[in-house]
Design a protein with these regions (language model features):
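Active-site entrance/lid segments in N-terminal catalytic domains of soluble metabolic enzymes
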Residues: 5-198
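Intrinsic-disorder-associated, low-complexity terminal segments enriched in Asp/Asn/His/Tyr and depleted
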Residues: 1-2
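A short glycine-centered flexible hinge/capping loop motif at secondary-structure junctions
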Residues: 200-204
């Protein structure tokens, strides 16, 4: 079976249970259940980004979380493949919105979570707050730092993450504050950690 061979040959595929080492961008407002299921059904990892499936914003953390729950359930109706939900960490504390969605992710037994972070040292408290409960519930964790560094990658690995995503300045959306290209940031980090590493930014 070629699909099983591909999984065994690629550590990202093996860890996340996907067929192709492709992780869909967790774009705010753009993703929905149909989008995510299509990516997962094609062998990649589809991700429900912030405000997935929504056309308007709510200031109520509980309603935000319940909207994500409904989108998770819709996704499950469209695919039996692994998919992920995004959790956002910023500043030096977790927001009530993030923690409410964390609860939903655990309750719904989502197979994978993508944590969008802003890099160590300010993220250490957030890593501890998010990664431990996810690990305790056997949810795979992909951490994408917008300020990737060897130090951050090591901390992420120590806190139990399964995959680290390094983002270069080539990317679209929220740009890293340092102007280091994607293919320059990768060799800085890949030999410093043992968990699989993915690269984001300017790759097509």
């Amino acid at each position: 079976n070629n699909r099983e061979v591909n999984k065994k040959m690629n550590r990202v595929c093996e860890v996340l249970g996907i067929e192709k080492p492709i992780i869909q961008g967790a774009m705010s407002w753009i993703t929905n259940a149909e989008f995510v299921a299509a990516v997962s059904n094609a062998g990649g990892l589809g991700i429900l980004g912030p405000n997935a499936g929504q056309k308007d914003i709510t200031s109520d953390p509980d309603e935000t979380a319940e909207r994500m729950r409904r989108e998770i359930q819709k996704t499950r109706e469209l695919t039996d493949k692994p998919f992920a939900v995004t959790l956002i960490g910023s500043g030096n504390s977790t927001s009530v919105f993030t923690m409410k969605i964390l609860d939903v992710v655990i309750e719904e037994k989502v197979p994978v979570v993508l944590i969008n972070s802003y890099g160590f040292p300010g993220m250490l408290g957030i890593y501890k707050a998010l990664l431990k409960p996810l690990k305790d519930n056997n949810i795979k964790m992909v951490v994408r730092s917008i300020l990737p560094s060897v130090e951050d990658a090591k901390v992420v690995e120590e806190q139990g993450a399964d995959v680290y995503v390094a983002t270069g300045f080539d990317e679209g959306g929220t740009l890293p504050p340092r102007m280091i290209g994607s293919f320059n940031i990768l060799p800085m980090i890949k030999d410093a950690i043992n968990i699989p590493i993915c690269l984001a930014g300017g790759i097509a």
